[in-house]
Amino acid sequence: MAETGAGAAARVAEEQSRNGSDPGRRGAGGFGRPSLLRRLANEIEKRLAADLDARDPDFIRENLPLAWLASSLWFRGEVRGMERIPESGPVLLVGNHSGGNVTPDTTVFTLAFNAYFGVERPFYQLAHNLVLTSPIGPFLRRFGTVAASHENARKALDGGAAVLVYPGGDWEVNRPTWESNRIDFAGRKGFIRLALDAGVPIVPVVSIGGQETAIFLTHGERLAKFLRLDKLLRLKTLPVNLSLPWIVNVGDFFGHLPLPAKITVQVMEPIDLRERYGEDPDVERIYDEITTAMQEQLNELAEERRLPILG
């Protein structure tokens, strides 16, 4: 998985310190106040470290009925194949991602997982740093959301949890609406190495409908690079969409009011990587076969839909 923005900042700050170029230090000998960059990076790292105990089963139990009702009425969420997920033990759930920063597919699946397996089963969802540091971050943490990193995911898996990861991240979630029915992980294979290292099965989770909750126009990757957002905030894109209440929404930093598109999620059969690919598996082959299978499943879901939004 990619290095977090805070991790990159900490690494840069450390290199500056070693090279004597730390802008936060003054005078000969490097005396003076610590680098603002280092202090900021350390603070962000502390906030984003996976606190698995932040997940609150009682809180989930209290809020699940109303949240599921609201989600069902607005998105008409339908989740199929939950019985394919192993009943216990660690598992890596790998999904395609849609809907900008609102990500209704995550909401629908998270609620369904807790309803099906019970709130006591440990279940964590990996999310972008900006989500965890937003005003709704504390609420999401209580539902099991942690910052997306290899370390956080491994910690949860080692603890016996089910972990939901979206390899496509901010790239896939902001793909243009006319590419709605496309799996696009942007070549990111960290989830495969994570599953191999942790010795857990992969369960693909394919969803459709999220990219109909707004009109997504562009990833905005050139603009993000020009503004150095990839370095500062770990953002590879500065997407543009047409959505309420902003009409023209640049960055989707504050989210948007999603259109009530029907969200359908299909859970696929679990994959034991060692059993299927041997003790020295080819990561490229695994990636190609998993994404191809997920694309075929997404194509089937797309064929079922009659009209955008209505499903």
Task: Outline where the language-model segments fall.
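Short acidic/His/Gly/Ser-rich catalytic and metal-binding motifs that mark active-site loops
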Residues: 166, 172-176
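A cross-family acyltransferase "interaction/gating" segment
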Residues: 169, 179-278
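Membrane-anchoring hydrophobic helices of lipid-metabolizing enzymes
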Residues: 2-152, 220, 254, 299-311
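C-terminal terminal-subdomain/extension
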Residues: 255-311
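Hydrophobic/aromatic ligand-binding patch that stacks against planar heteroaromatic rings
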Residues: 139, 155, 193-197
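Generic beta-sheet signal
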Residues: 126-128, 166, 205
